[in-house]
Amino acid sequence: MVEPAIGRNHIRAGRHHGRARIVFARTKNHAYLSHDAYCSRYPPIGRENADRLRIRTVVDRRTGRGAERWHRSPRQANGRFSNQRYSSTSPNSSPACPLIYFISIKAKRIACVVSAVIFVATSCVSPLTGFAFWETNLAYEGESIYNYLQVKNLSDRTILSTNVLFGVQSVTMKDKGLTGMYYDTALAAPALADNANSALILGMGTGTYARQLKQYYPKMNITGVEIDQKITDLAGEYFDEPADIPVTTYDGRAWLAASHDKYDVIMVDAYQDITIPFQMSSTEFFTMVREHLNPGGVMVVNMNMISDGQGSINEALSDTIASVFGNGNTLTADVPNTTNRELFAKKPGSGSEENSMQQASKALNLRETTYERTGSEDLEWYMEEVASRFRKVNEPDSASTILTDDKAPVEVLGMHAIDQIIADEAGPYRQILKDEGFGGLLRAVQ
């Protein structure tokens, strides 16, 4: 951009401020902010020992595009500034460019002032009222190094959410029954396994799955791993996490790498909201999980998004897991009225047909095994309903959809799934808006 010629009559404001003289000027097509500063290359630091640095920010008033130019004049031994200048230009780099642009064009000053007042007011009030200021039943609201955290105390349950507006990360039921969430479907894992004596939970949260396992399998030895220490603290304070369950604050994959223990059930629930960490989605990770299962053991993975079709995130995860556990050993089950899908993968055990995944997942066998191990008729009949939702996952025909440590684009695949979910949810409203206008849309959302 060509720098405009500035005359004395173009100067709008100028003053000395500390060690810098600040000037704002405006021409027909350009505006600029200029100030002299002083920079020292060596001690002692001070204006008398420093070079002069003239900084000029120029903005084209017609386009809003700007650039910043520096002129450095070295100080000579006699104290005067050299006429030799060292200059450099950085286009569109200065944070002052938008400010200069809006001041120079005098655009919508009232709107700018109102917006600034609202911004300042909400910035001051939000730390006092909390992010979810509309909630009236919050027991806790805060942040950890990993998450926004919200504990809500309802009449029948206490829930933990890691999102301001939606979603439930963990829940504890005050009547100690089933939760109505994906944890209930995941209770099929101990019934699918050859034995149900031990369990590892990667992504312990506040211990929802651990509490359910303890309720229905009281003799089971359970170990938890949770990366967020603050969530573990909240589990003890608000969610009655069983005190006899050891919980380690660590990354799930790193914990597996350091452990030699084996388990009958491993729950992978380390996916935050609707995001999936790539290091816990690859063949290398699932191979590590498989090695920590006893023969006949079952891994259950909570997938937060129901996304089908070629190239989807669920296809990639399912194919990756099936490639590790072998053909016929992987099942999925969608969770009703949610966007969750549970995936079960079994490590071959004794080799007998009756212990295979195909046999164990049949409704009658799943019911009988559940009742024999838990004595709960409610859970027994619920498992029959779960069995009706099982879908077999075959090994992939090619390696194109298999995720590895070298190639796991789960962020991109996840965003595609989110876009599809939003499109599906917004579809009916888009049609109402088209047919009935804004009035019809307002009536529809009331």
Swiss-Prot record:
Main subcellular localisation: cytoplasm
Swiss-Prot/TrEMBL catalytic activity: S-adenosyl 3-(methylsulfanyl)propylamine + putrescine = S-methyl-5'-thioadenosine + spermidine + H(+)
GO biological process: spermidine biosynthetic process
Compartments (UniProt record): Cytoplasm
GO CC, alphabetical: cytoplasm
CDD domains: AdoMet_MTases
Binding site for S-methyl-5'-thioadenosine: 147, 226, 251-252
Active site positions, chain numbering: 269 (proton acceptor)
Keywords linked to the UniProt accession: Cytoplasm, Polyamine biosynthesis, Spermidine biosynthesis, Transferase
GO MF, any single term: spermidine synthase activity
Domain PABS: 116-351
EC numbers on record: 2.5.1.16
Pathway assigned in UniProt: Amine and polyamine biosynthesis; spermidine biosynthesis; spermidine from putrescine: step 1/1
A Pfam cross-reference name: Spermine_synth
Keyword Cytoplasm among UniProt keywords: yes
Alphabetized Gene3D superfamilies for the sequence: Vaccinia Virus protein VP39
Location of the region described as Disordered in the Swiss-Prot/TrEMBL record: 64-94
Xref: InterPro entries: PABS, SAM-dependent_MTases_sf
Region: Unknown, residue numbers: 1-117
Biased composition (Polar residues): 75-94
Subunit note: Homodimer or homotetramer.
Function: Catalyzes the irreversible transfer of a propylamine group from the amino donor S-adenosylmethioninamine (decarboxy-AdoMet) to putrescine (1,4-diaminobutane) to yield spermidine.
PANTHER family for this protein: THERMOSPERMINE SYNTHASE ACAULIS5
Family, as annotated: Belongs to the spermidine/spermine synthase family.
Protein name: Probable polyamine aminopropyl transferase
Species in which this protein is naturally found: Bifidobacterium longum (strain NCC 2705)
Lineage of source species: Bacteria, Bacillati, Actinomycetota, Actinomycetes, Bifidobacteriales
